[in-house]
């Protein structure tokens, strides 16, 4: 009976993804809209090994071997993304232990209607591959959290996901932090520290394995990494560069309060609302 109740919440999340997905992105699916790279890669997956996306390159080679032609189809690729997002929602309901149908629906709706999804669909030629990378990150976290030695396969899964698209490393990181915060009160301080180090080890292990596989693929396929966004220097990390990255992150976070950010906060009202939005968590923390 309890399993059936949990299944209902998962079905609610998945259904919310399908309904809200087609409502929010139906215009993309019923029209062919190309931005930037999508205009150039109708029949490809874009930069692979040269951008450090060795897993995407390997997937493309396998697809070519079996005769599968990649095409930037709005309906096919968009539908695959909706399906993959629904699977993500189901896993997140279980992972975050959501026990109310309304919250499950909200999770599914937010997951598919988030602005990053609209950006993803702008590059429809590679959208399902990138969504698959998101799913892999969630699977990695689920495996590491649910099973005693799950961090070992999780390391491999994280590395492969980063090999498709490096950006989604933040998905695993954020989920680990959320789970630590959720379980903090139910464990002792020592147990919390042990769990934190296990998750940190999993993340670092996945990143190191990604770089190792990237180096191997570069050697095998005789590829040179491109300079775009500093990809050719992504493994050259120093303490100074880390401090600089943290500084830029905080400056970028608070920038909408003080000045315009890409046209988003050009009006004073928007800046004031940004200030309220940023300061609200601090106020709630002080009250509690």
Where are these regions (language model features)?
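Perimembrane helix-loop-helix junctions
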Residues: 171-204
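Transmembrane alpha-helices of multi-pass, membrane-embedded glycan-processing enzymes
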Residues: 60-64, 76-91, 129, 133-136, ...
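Specific aromatic-rich, kink-prone transmembrane helix
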Residues: 131-148, 153-158, 175-184
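Start-transfer (signal-anchor) and selected internal transmembrane alpha helices
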Residues: 1-22
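Membrane-interface micro-motifs in multi-pass membrane enzymes
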Residues: 49, 53, 77-83, 102-145, ...
């Amino acid at each position: 009976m309890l399993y059936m109740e949990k299944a209902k919440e998962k079905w609610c999340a998945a259904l919310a993804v399908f309904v809200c997905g087609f409502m929010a992105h139906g215009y993309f699916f019923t029209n062919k809209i190309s931005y930037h790279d999508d205009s150039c890669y109708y029949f490809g997956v874009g930069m692979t090994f040269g951008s450090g996306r060795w897993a995407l390159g390997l997937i493309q080679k396998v697809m070519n071997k079996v005769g599968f032609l990649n095409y930037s189809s709005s309906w096919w690729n968009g539908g695959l993304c909706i399906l993959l997002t629904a699977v993500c929602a189901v896993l997140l309901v279980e992972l975050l232990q959501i026990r109310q149908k309304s919250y499950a629906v909200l999770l599914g709706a937010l997951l598919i209607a988030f602005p990053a999804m609209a950006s993803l669909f702008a590059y429809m030629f590679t959208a399902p591959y990138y969504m698959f990378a998101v799913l892999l990150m969630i699977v990695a976290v689920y495996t590491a959290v649910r099973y005693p030695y799950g961090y070992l396969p999780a390391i491999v899964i994280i590395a492969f996901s980063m090999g498709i698209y490096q950006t989604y490393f933040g998905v695993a990181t954020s989920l680990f932090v959320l789970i630590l915060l959720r379980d903090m009160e139910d464990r002792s301080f020592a147990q919390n520290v042990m769990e934190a180090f296990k998750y940190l080890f999993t993340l670092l292990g996945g990143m190191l394995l990604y770089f190792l596989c990237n180096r191997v693929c570069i050697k095998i396929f005789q590829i040179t990494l491109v300079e775009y966004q500093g990809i050719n220097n992504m493994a050259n990390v120093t303490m100074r560069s880390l401090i600089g990255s943290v500084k830029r992150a905080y400056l970028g976070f608070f920038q909408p309060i003080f000045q315009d950010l890409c046209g988003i906060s050009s009006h004073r009202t928007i800046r004031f609302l940004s200030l309220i939005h940023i300061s609200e968590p601090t106020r709630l923390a002080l009250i509690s």
